[in-house]
Amino acid sequence: MSPKRRTQAERAMETQGKLIAAALGVLREKGYAGFRIADVPGAAGVSRGAQSHHFPTKLELLLATFEWLYEQITERSRARLAKLKPEDDVIQQMLDDAAEFFLDDDFSISLDLIVAADRDPALREGIQRTVERNRFVVEDMWLGVLVSRGLSRDDAEDILWLIFNSVRGLAVRSLWQKDKERFERVRNSTLEIARERYAKFKR
């Protein structure tokens, strides 16, 4: 029996996936400032025409790449939340989830694009939509867990802000300073403070 032929939609998805993966590679190597859309087709192993068909502009390719990054992280957060048990340490899980996102090697790519978006309204609008569909959704899911465990919405938001903003700050600091021992101390201090606040707020 001959293998089943792929549909046009399947072939299109495969090509788009190759282009996004190649765009990520270029961003990792050269950053936003050095990103050239002309470098992507060759790295992806597709023609320039195929790239132009799926992502006619640099903006469209960058936004698709940014969205793919955030969707992968969102799915990992959903999986973590789905496995969460009543007896689990929710504060530890939140910290681990934040670290998986903000301390991932590719966070610097998203940060680079976010900074660039400050000078590009179209890029900023697209990034904002992706953040709202992904990071805000993840935060709302964690807030729902905290509220279900007896915290008010305001208290839950305080804890989420404490954890996520602390880890985000460590991620930004790591761009110019590597101090693993201090990072661990600050991370453990964040965990300790958040646990204390959780115990205090829990009804």
UniProtKB/Swiss-Prot annotation:
The keyword NADP does not apply. One of its GO terms (molecular function) is DNA binding. Signal peptide: none annotated. Keywords: DNA-binding, Repressor, Transcription, Transcription regulation. Induction: Induced by p-cumate. Residues 36-55 bind DNA. InterPro entries: Homeodomain-like_sf (IPR009057), HTH_TetR (IPR001647), Tet_transcr_reg_TetR-rel_C_sf (IPR036271). The keyword Nucleus does not apply. It comes from the Bacteria. Residues 13-73 form the HTH tetR-type domain. Involved in the repression of the cym and cmt operons which are responsible of the p-cymene degradation. This is HTH-type transcriptional regulator CymR.
